[in-house]
Amino acid sequence: MHTTITMVLAVLLLGAAIATADEPARKVLKHVVMYKFRDDCTAEQIQEVIDAFSGLPKKVDAIIGFERGTNVSQEGKSEGLTHCFVVTFKDEAGLAAYLKHPAHDAYVKVVKDKREKVVVFDYWADAK
């Protein structure tokens, strides 16, 4: 009886290991946008940008995740970048749909004359 249970467990574990090895890790596409705002921007203008960007997930179905924050690095290597937004998509088609979406175009109009510098970085990450 003990040998039978051991063999069944071994087969189940082997099957799980094979299934896991055959399945590719699921990835998501992260779209990172960082800003340095112009020195003459008011706190209200910066908040307008934050609110406009933060509203995009409700307007663009392709967005599956959204995060934002301000720089708190102690390293002093941010080159003046103060705000970061991370938008997550399931694939490149989602990012492409977002970039040409009217809500994105409207957001760009809000931010374009308030930013001094923008850095955009896209990468594939393991889905959680």
Protein language model features and the residues they cover:
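Alpha-helical and His/Cys-centered functional microenvironments
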Residues: T6, Y35, V108
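Short, structured active-site "lid" loops
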Residues: V86
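Bacterial N-terminal signal peptides
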Residues: T6-A16
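N-terminal compositionally biased, intrinsically disordered segments and leader/signal-like regions
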Residues: T4-M7, A21
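C-terminal partner/receptor-binding element of secreted or periplasmic proteins
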Residues: V111-V120, W124-K128
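C-terminal structural segments of small proteins and small subunits
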Residues: E92-K100, D105-K112
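Short S/T/G/P-rich N-terminal loop/turn motif that feeds into the first structured element of a domain
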Residues: L14-T82, K90-A97, Y123-K128
